[in-house]
Amino acid sequence: MSTLSEGPVARLLKEKLFAAFQPKHLEVECESHLHNVPKGAEKHFRVQVVSDEFEGKRVIERHRLVNTCLAKELATTVHALRIDAIPTSKWDGQKQEDSPTCRGGFGK
């Protein structure tokens, strides 16, 4: 399990995802620096969760599970969440692709 960002929001997301899914692999990365937000903001995240809990579920079902797990944060602190929810049997150690830099938002 790895965590690429260690701010308080990232740590909370990691803790909640780990408790809910007991993942074989977990990455939580704050991508707010790619967006037009104040320095140090933790608003935009991507997560990669590899878990047996996702076996036999469609992508939309896996995403709903993650969104439900993080519902409080999505309603308050987190503005955007990119999800890679992968069944353990389908994971081959691949890393997430880099997200593109934000091209919109206030002041762009």
Swiss-Prot record:
PANTHER family: BOLA TRANSCRIPTION REGULATOR (PTHR46229), BOLA-LIKE PROTEIN 1 (PTHR46229:SF2)
Domain of life: Eukaryota
Pfam families per the UniProt record, alphabetical: BolA
Family: Belongs to the BolA/IbaG family.
Natural source organism: Caenorhabditis elegans
Gene3D superfamilies the record matches: BolA-like
Region listing for Disordered, in residue ranges: 89-108
Name of the protein in its database record: Putative bolA-like protein K11H12.1
Gene Ontology CC: one annotated term: mitochondrion
